[in-house]
A protein has these predicted regions:
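Amphipathic alpha-helical scaffolding segments comprising HEAT/armadillo-like alpha-solenoid repeats
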Residues: 1-7, 25-38, 57-67
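Phosphate-handling active-site elements
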Residues: 180-202
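Glycine/serine-rich anion-binding loops at beta->alpha junctions
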Residues: 157-180
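Short, conserved "active-site rim" segments that organize catalytic pockets and cofactor/ligand binding
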Residues: 104-156
Length: 241
């Protein structure tokens, strides 16, 4: 924020770059500096764009609303929020998604994905994710994570498929582990992923909601004829496989 407001200078990061990077924080400590930059001659437009895609503003909404009485750029931010540009600018859900299956027979509970003995490592998602499916089980190889990596080499996204998915209480750390292996990188947020595909004959409601909130395409379907390594096409709008 000091670079963006020109309190200090940096040869590597310009004030415009700094304003852009503030906008990648999604909310919190970046909000007040961005509001102060709205009327900056150099960075004002970049601050508008950054705030238009920032939702975690909390009480600072009132500050922007008050500022909009005298600031055109603050008015632009309110208009962008009102028109939900942050949402409508996102990529549309594809009409068809081709994916390759990683199937785990039987019930997968959150302890399979985020084992309690490894709870100490849950804040470190890449490390904790190494414990996913660490306990041997029938129908799964002894090195399941390596098998996921082999499936990825086919060039398609990997879908986690099971009979019963996500029972148990550790749904967030379990989701983090799953997405670390089959999800997509989040720009400017290290060591965490989004997206991914999960299909279950039954999916526990709290895990279903947590996966949805994490950007996962998760749904229930008949998985009896879906087998490890199968390539399938999902048609989200039609609700068909």
């Amino acid at each position: 924020s000091d670079i963006a407001s020109k309190k200090i200078s940096c040869e590597l990061i310009s004030p415009m770059d700094a304003t852009y990077y503030l906008g990648t924080m999604l909310g919190g400590y970046n909000v007040e500096p961005l509001i102060s930059l709205l009327d900056d001659p150099e960075c004002g437009d970049a601050a508008v764009k950054a705030l238009s895609n920032t939702l975690l503003v909390f009480d600072a909404f009132n500050d922007i609303a008050e500022k909009s009485k005298s600031s055109e750029n603050a008015s632009k931010v309110l208009k962008s929020w009102a028109e939900a540009e942050w949402f409508l600018s996102k990529p549309e859900v594809p009409e068809r998604i081709d994916t390759i299956i990683f199937k785990v027979p039987g019930e997968t509970n959150t302890d399979d994905l985020s084992p309690a003995p490894d709870a100490w490592s849950r804040p470190d998602i890449p490390l904790h994710a190494l414990s996913m499916y660490k306990m041997p089980r029938e129908g799964l190889t002894n090195e399941p994570l390596k098998e996921i990596e082999e499936l990825k080499k086919k060039g398609l996204p990997v879908a986690l498929v099971g009979d019963v998915m996500g029972t148990g209480s550790s749904r967030k750390s379990a989701t983090n582990s799953v997405l670390w292996h089959i999800g997509e990188d989040i720009p400017f947020i290290p060591n965490k992923k989004t997206g991914g595909i999960c299909i279950g004959e039954k999916v526990a409601p709290i895990s279903f909601n947590t996966m949805e909130d994490s950007g996962t395409l998760v749904f229930e379907a008949d998985v009896e004829n879906l087998n490890m390594g199968d390539v399938i096409s999902i048609f989200p709008a039609k609700g068909e496989i």
